[in-house]
């Protein structure tokens, strides 16, 4: 048995048959070729395993995000796949992203490293105040949340946007002028 690190050059692993293939930081992969080649390589192997280890990323058109969406469907029972073990560390949609105790859901090691959890508090405060790419990076890399974000957003303070929300339907605007 050998442990072999593979480069991103997928041509070098065509026909490769691993018992264990680990795709690390899948969010950074431009395409799904490495995953597909590993998947193809294990199909005739008994008890082979492919593991994808990654944080969330910035590209909602990436193969990693597509796999994430599929895995969420499996976890919710919308899709079925008994051959795949899925573990996604993330907060619930209703969780307040500024509550440090909620961060443990997205970053479970913080349960055992309370100093690291405390160290994240000023980082979060800075990200919230600065907005832009600093906030984006905090949300994606520390809270493991997928977001599509550009730095030239119209509304930088999402609290303002949230406070402006109203519960109206299109029917409420029938007959009204719209610009």
Predicted features along the sequence, with ranges:
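Conserved RecA-like ASCE ATPase "motif II neighborhood" in helicase/translocase motors
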Residues: 1-43, 164
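Non-catalytic, compositionally simple segments
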Residues: 32, 37, 43-179
